[in-house]
Amino acid sequence: MVRRRPATGAAQRPQLAAVGRGLLLASVLAAAASSLPVAESSCPRDNSLVRDISRMQQSNYGREGFSHITVTGALAHGTKEVEVWLQTFGPGQRTPIHRHSCEEVFIVLKGKGTLLLGSSSLKYPGQPQEVPVFQNTTFSIPVNDPHQVW
């Protein structure tokens, strides 16, 4: 997922899901360096040029069937303009309908699901549209457009 950070720099964790099948997504959070505050973290920084994803800290944020890895990020790696996330959603998972004050771009690495997008840029503004997503596809969400993935 590619996502521009809000001006506050307080990026929310994206939530993606799949019902009846698993979904593996790569996420990227992009931001203008000028809008980011200097972040302090108790996390040890890993400034290695090459990192082994299988050794990176993984969290589920208390959600069964969900896995999140920050591949590179501001707190753990000191990046200023981009964060990259790798997330896995198990069968039966679904996000709430939500929106962000930033753009997002998703890359589906494995599995399939459905994107529900309520966008003012669609043919029928205000009418949510269901769009199938599957392995090797990408999709982007405009700023503030409500969306849900399952």
Curated annotation (Swiss-Prot):
Subcellular location: Endoplasmic reticulum lumen
Gene3D superfamilies: Jelly Rolls
Residues carrying sugar: 136
Annotated Pfam families: Auxin_BP
Alphabetized SUPFAM superfamilies for the sequence: RmlC-like cupins
Keywords: Auxin signaling pathway, Endoplasmic reticulum, Glycoprotein, Metal-binding, Receptor, Signal, Zinc
GO biological process terms held by the UniProt record: auxin-activated signaling pathway; cytokinesis by cell plate formation; positive regulation of cell division; positive regulation of cell size; positive regulation of DNA endoreduplication; unidimensional cell growth
Key word Endoplasmic reticulum present: yes
Transmembrane segments: none
Gene Ontology molecular function, alphabetical: auxin binding; zinc ion binding
Superkingdom: Eukaryota
Complex formation: Homodimer.
Protein name: Auxin-binding protein 5
